[in-house]
């Protein structure tokens, strides 16, 4: 397995990190345990210091529909920023897949949180084309979501192969 510390980041501009932000929340959408965020912070900080654009990819809960507001990261973004101690650019998956990278200022590294990956049918179906539509926009994919790695889902299975 390759280590991030051994990579040459000179030609790496866009990095996707599969994180596990499936955090427990209370009835008021307050995060009750930040352990999963804390575990990802070191890797995110390391790549952030390499001046790359970072795209955080995660699931949250088990939504039964394509979009369910109660499983949207939009309700948690402020808490994520407080815990992780950096600003996040929240973008929906539709925007990312269509033009997300084109809309970002690549001269100024950005950390973006993509909407809940489980809103998209291709995730659960482990769809290769869905995976490629994301990884084709990336120079590097990092799986930091070891707790989700047993899933046969696109973001932990197919993306690692692309």
Where in the sequence are the language-model features?
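Active-site loop-to-helix "anion-binding N-cap" substructures in soluble metabolic enzymes
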Residues: 1-162
């Amino acid at each position: 397995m390759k280590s991030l510390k051994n990579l040459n980041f000179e030609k790496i501009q866009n990095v996707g990190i599969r994180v596990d932000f499936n955090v427990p929340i209370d009835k008021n959408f307050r995060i009750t345990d930040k352990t999963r965020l804390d575990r990802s912070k070191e890797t995110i900080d390391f790549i952030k210091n390499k001046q790359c654009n970072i795209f955080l990819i995660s699931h949250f809960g088990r939504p039964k529909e394509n979009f369910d507001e109660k499983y949207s990261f939009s309700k948690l973004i402020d808490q994520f920023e407080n815990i992780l101690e950096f600003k996040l650019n929240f973008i929906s998956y539709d925007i990312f897949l269509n033009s997300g990278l084109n809309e970002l200022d690549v001269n100024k590294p950005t950390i973006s949180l993509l909407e809940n990956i489980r809103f998209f049918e291709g995730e659960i179906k482990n769809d290769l084309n869905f995976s490629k539509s994301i990884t084709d926009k990336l120079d590097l994919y990092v799986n930091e979501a070891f707790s989700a790695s047993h899933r046969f889902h696109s973001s932990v299975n197919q993306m690692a192969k692309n």
